[in-house]
A protein has these predicted regions:
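C-terminal catalytic "cap/lid" subdomain
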Residues: 1-185
Length: 185
């Protein structure tokens, strides 16, 4: 547990370093410092993520947390954090960054005929299955479920390729980018 927590803080430090290089001031808020439990109903007050225009950008990430369910600890997914932050705070955009494709694909990214789905709604169908041996946090399925919930409240919900940071800039500047826009239905 300590090793995973340490690794997550190290990764967050790298992300914050890149943001600082771009002139952005950030503050780090590891969930293990302020939350308990897992899933969308984890315990923890997210109101301190509200900020004024001249205050540092608060950052957080998926983490190993203590639980009250008898297991002792569990993984709080960043997707569940996104759900709480997006639905409890005044949010204009919710952007999920993934690392293996341009956005949601018709089938797993490595498959021959897999194509980007530019708009994804509650009735959109994809193929594939989640491998919980590789990803214990829910994979793309949880990301899709949470993004659909968020889209009921937040108009601009996207899943895009995090390996291409200019796409975030394009989205914020023009309202469009290569990726998948999540529709409320």
């Amino acid at each position: 547990m300590k090793e995973i927590r340490s690794d997550m803080r190290e990764l967050n430090g790298l992300v914050m370093g890149k943001m600082k290089e771009r002139g952005l001031q950030c503050s780090s808020h590891p969930p293990s410092d302020w939350a308990t439990g897992t899933g969308a109903n984890f315990s923890g007050d997210v109101s301190f993520f509200e900020r004024g225009p001249n205050e540092p950008i608060p950052t957080t990430f998926g983490d190993v947390l203590e639980t009250d369910d008898g297991t002792g600890f569990g993984i709080l997914s960043g997707d569940d954090l996104m759900l709480r932050l997006s639905t409890e705070l005044e949010v204009t955009h919710c952007i999920f960054l993934i690392g293996d494709s341009d956005g949601i694909m018709t089938s797993p990214p490595g498959e021959k005929d897999s194509k980007l789905i530019p708009h994804f709604g509650p009735d959109t169908i994809i193929s594939g299955k989640h491998d919980s041996d590789i990803d214990v946090t829910g994979g793309i399925g949880l990301k899709i479920d949470r993004s659909l919930e968020i889209a009921k409240i937040v108009e601009e919900v996207w899943i895009i390729d995090g390996r291409k940071p200019d796409r975030v800039v394009d989205l914020l500047a023009s309202g469009e980018t290569i990726g998948t826009k999540i529709l409320s239905g």
